[in-house]
């Protein structure tokens, strides 16, 4: 199957090259996560804070402690784990109770982002299945075409959430005044990843998002989107405020959710 990304139409990325780039991003991510687990194991709870001098936590001990707390008998306000997963983590009911608009923004970003990630995982699974010689009723290229519609749908859902976030940061005074540089970097990164995906697809297909750009630029545009997605959406997470997408669910599960 030919990939859309490349330096040019004649120099498109291969499966092995895509896997190497992905592996690099995953290794950087895992290294950062181990560091975060060590800090949390040492009692650090704030973003960008370091453990006290001479104190070093254990990633394994942190995970064991967290899992023990998740499995511990529920305290008075605790909720069943399945309820916490569905209502507190997926549907984010805590945010909904505080602000419906903010909830809609968060939910569209979360649902769009995670759905696109899941679709990418399915695409990877189909490619790997073919590589190991298992025959499927469709080729990877045909499966990619099947995923095009849901990719568009969830891409636009993500875009709606991102645009709401941009408008809030720019024009809602209390949100703008409370924003710090980390917030702008996070939002800017998500915006660039989202828009670059639409533009890369638009150049290739000739739809409105192509803005009349030469089709020759389609492979480099797709390559830019692929690389920045791997860097920002995977490798950068443990080193940024974006770590809250992992830390918050862990804390909610450990506390058994609820209000």
UniProtKB/Swiss-Prot annotation:
Membrane-crossing residue ranges in chain numbering: 15-35, 104-124, 147-167, 180-200, 218-238
Cofactor comment: Binds 2 heme b (iron(II)-protoporphyrin IX) groups per subunit.
Keyword Transmembrane among UniProt keywords: yes
Superkingdom of source: Archaea
Pfam family of the protein (one): Nitrate_red_gam
Gene3D superfamilies noted in UniProt: Transmembrane di-heme cytochromes, Chain C (1.20.950.20)
Family (UniProt): Belongs to the HdrE family.
Assembly description: The dihydromethanophenazine:CoB--CoM heterodisulfide reductase is composed of two subunits; HdrD and HdrE.
Protein name, per record: Dihydromethanophenazine:CoB--CoM heterodisulfide reductase subunit E
Organism: Methanosarcina mazei (strain ATCC BAA-159 / DSM 3647 / Goe1 / Go1 / JCM 11833 / OCM 88)
């Amino acid at each position: 199957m030919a990939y859309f990304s490349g330096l040019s139409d004649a120099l498109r990325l291969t499966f092995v090259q895509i896997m190497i780039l992905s592996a690099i991003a995953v290794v950087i991510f895992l290294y950062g996560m181990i560091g975060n687990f060590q800090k949390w194991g040492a009692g650090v709870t704030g973003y960008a804070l370091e453990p006290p001098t001479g104190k070093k936590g254990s990633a394994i001990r942190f995970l064991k402690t967290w899992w023990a707390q998740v499995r511990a008998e529920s305290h008075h306000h605790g909720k069943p784990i399945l309820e916490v997963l569905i209502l507190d983590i997926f549907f984010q009911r805590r945010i909904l109770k505080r602000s419906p608009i903010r909830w809609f923004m968060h939910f569209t970003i979360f649902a769009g982002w995670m759905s696109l990630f899941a679709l990418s995982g399915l695409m990877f699974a189909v490619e790997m299945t073919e590589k190991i010689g298992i025959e499927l009723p469709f080729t990877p290229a045909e499966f990619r075409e099947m995923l095009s519609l849901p990719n568009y749908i969830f891409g636009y859902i993500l875009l709606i959430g991102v645009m709401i976030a941009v408008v809030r940061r720019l024009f809602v005074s209390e949100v703008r005044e409370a924003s710090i540089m980390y917030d702008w970097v996070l939002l800017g990164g998500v915006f660039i990843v989202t828009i670059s995906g639409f533009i890369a697809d638009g150049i290739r297909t000739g739809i409105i998002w192509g803005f009349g750009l030469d089709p020759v630029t389609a492979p480099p545009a797709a390559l830019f989107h692929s690389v920045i997605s791997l860097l920002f959406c995977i490798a950068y997470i443990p080193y940024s405020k974006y770590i809250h997408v992992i830390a918050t669910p862990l804390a909610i599960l450990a506390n058994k959710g609820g209000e």
